[in-house]
Each structure stands twice: as structure tokens, then as C-alpha cells.
């Protein structure tokens, strides 16, 4: 490729990024004044595929209930990592039955898991941040990429009150890496509002929430929190970094350290 071609490609890419960012900002302004049902209906009515990825947490259940109850044209997907709590797995079927919807499951590739285990061991994520990020990459990031392939809008259950590094979460933001717009319809909902809504609407939730698990991920990487701790304090609790994330919502350099199945011994 010539230098001129590279420059033209860079200019085109920059234009795409600017357009995505402008659309996200315009959407953010529109979503702010709407209620949850209105926010989701607005996204469902846009041109392009909208995908909601649920971890079956309490806020995700609120969104799933709104999608199902209003029969919105939004795909619902979940990442079956292979290390989920039994309670979480059971809730998938219960939620499908309750709202007569399909929750599409996305699984990690066996070859990727084998490569990870060969390099780090089954529970190597306890040994280093690098190994933990690699596990999240294999079990979450790669399946997520398949779930979002071809999507224009990615709906999440992110809330500003979940952790310090989510405190400025907007209703809509450009995800340049994935080439789509991320929608956070519950960004301004507090946990008390979530709990009251769940109780009023009879929304099924994970029983682990009542046992001290406000944030629930994979079983080996989640513990109950102590009184007064932040909502996500039980996630990867053995790590010291306050910005503990799996890489789904906050890109992390080490999340690119995903074992290559072709190099597995």
C-alpha cells in the first residue's frame, strides 16, 4: 500500500470515528429525558442491529424484563463462560420462560480454553493480573466479539453507582474499537431504585443478591461483600487495583494476552 493510500485510509477512519462520536452524543442527549422503556424503544427503532448482553445481574434483569414485556426488537445474549454460578445458569432458563424471549448463549472455544490451561493452569487467574486478563479474554471477550458481530448498538447494564471508574457513565458512548455505540439505559439508576423496581414488577433475580453478592460474575472470581464495601468489591477481590475490570467495558492492555490455540503445547 502506498503512502498516499495509507493517508487516505487514515482520513477515512478519522471521519468514521467522528461520525460515530457525533451520533453517540446526539443519542445521549435524547436518552437523558426518557424513562427506561422509552430509552429502549428509541434504540429498538433505530436502523441497525441492537444487542443487549446480560450477565443476569439485578440491573440486567430490569432491562431484560423491559425488552420482553414491551416486545422490543432487541436481541438478548449472554456469555456462558463455563465458570458461572449454578444460580446464574438456572436464572437464564427462568427468565426466558417468564418473558417468552430467547437469550442467546455464547460460549468460549474449547481450543482457547485448552490453550489457556496449558499456559496458566485451570485457576491461573489467581496467580497474576496477566493470567486473569487472559482468562477473561478467552471466556468473555472473544465470545462477546461474536455476539456483537454486525451490531450497531450494544446495550449494557452499566450504572454510575457500581464503582468509581463507572461514575461518569453516559447513556450513549462511541465504542470506537468495536465500531458501534454502547447504550447504558440504567446509567442514572441507583441500586435502591433498581431494587424497588424489581420488587414492584416481580422481576426474577439471582438469589445470590440476597446473600451479599450485589455484583455477580464467574464463581471463582466473585465473593460476597462486607457491609459498607462498594458494590463491585467482591469481583477479583485478591487484586489491589481499584479499577478491576474484565475488559468488556474498560479496555485493558493485558486483555490482549489471550493464549493462541495454535501454540498450545
Swiss-Prot record:
InterPro entries in UniProt: APS_reductase, PAPS/APS_Rdtase, PAPS_reduct_dom, Rossmann-like_a/b/a_fold
BP-aspect Gene Ontology terms: cysteine biosynthetic process; hydrogen sulfide biosynthetic process; sulfate assimilation, phosphoadenylyl sulfate reduction by phosphoadenylyl-sulfate reductase (thioredoxin)
Cofactor(s) the protein needs: [4Fe-4S] cluster
Matches recorded under HAMAP family: CysH
UniProt xrefs under Gene3D superfamilies: HUPs (3.40.50.620)
Family to which this protein belongs: Belongs to the PAPS reductase family. CysH subfamily.
Catalytic activity: [thioredoxin]-disulfide + sulfite + AMP + 2 H(+) = adenosine 5'-phosphosulfate + [thioredoxin]-dithiol
Pathway terms, separated by semicolons: Sulfur metabolism; hydrogen sulfide biosynthesis; sulfite from sulfate
Active site: residue positions: 246
UniProt keyword annotations, A-Z: Cytoplasm, Iron, Iron-sulfur, Metal-binding, Oxidoreductase
GO CC aspect terms: cytoplasm
Entry binding sites for [4Fe-4S] cluster: 135-136, 218, 221
PANTHER family: 5'-ADENYLYLSULFATE REDUCTASE 1, CHLOROPLASTIC (PTHR46482:SF9), 5'-ADENYLYLSULFATE REDUCTASE 3, CHLOROPLASTIC (PTHR46482)
Cellular localization per UniProt: Cytoplasm
Predominant location: cytoplasm
Protein's UniProt name: Adenosine 5'-phosphosulfate reductase
Gene Ontology molecular-function annotations: 4 iron, 4 sulfur cluster binding; adenylyl-sulfate reductase (thioredoxin) activity; metal ion binding; phosphoadenylyl-sulfate reductase (thioredoxin) activity
Function (record text): Catalyzes the formation of sulfite from adenosine 5'-phosphosulfate (APS) using thioredoxin as an electron donor.
Organism of origin: Rhizobium meliloti (strain 1021) (Ensifer meliloti)
Cofactor note: Binds 1 [4Fe-4S] cluster per subunit.
